[in-house]
Amino acid sequence: MQPLQNRPDLGEEILSQLYRPLEACYNTCYCKKCCYHCQFCFLKKGLGICYEQSRKRRRTPKKAKANTSSASNNRLIPNRTRHCQPEKAKKETVEKAVATAPGLGR
């Protein structure tokens, strides 16, 4: 066997290994030996880095979304108008009560 320094294709071999895509490894063990046995396992298990696309939440269908929004709008509008007017009346009655109530004398 030739020494590593005298091999002419050593640099090319190292570069080809460096830029080679990582192969999938289906070993689910997290022991030290399994975490360090390949670059993929080291990144995924050892460092906890995973470049896979994360699963996104399922969205509700547009039909269901449209029905709920229209129903919520119908419910909210009457509540707003119903609560706005009595608040003004309450404030007026409180102001009148404070103005007419005799204060505590000294």
From Swiss-Prot:
Composition bias, kind Polar residues: at what positions? 67-76
Q: Where is this region: Cysteine-rich?
A: 25-41
Composition bias (Basic residues) maps to: 55-65
Similarity section: Belongs to the lentiviruses Tat family.
According to the UniProt entry, its GO molecular function terms are: RNA binding; RNA-binding transcription regulator activity
Q: Where is the composition biased (Low complexity)?
A: 96-106
What segment(s) does the record annotate as region Core?
42-52
**UniProt organism field:** Simian immunodeficiency virus (isolate K78) (SIV-mac)
Q: What name does the UniProt record give this protein? A: Protein Tat
Q: How does it assemble?
A: Interacts with host CCNT1. Associates with the P-TEFb complex composed at least of Tat, P-TEFb (CDK9 and CCNT1), TAR RNA, RNA Pol II. Interacts with CCNT2; the resulting complex is unable to bind to TAR RNA.
* Pfam families named among the record's database cross-references: Tat
Which superkingdom does the taxonomy of this entry point to? Viruses
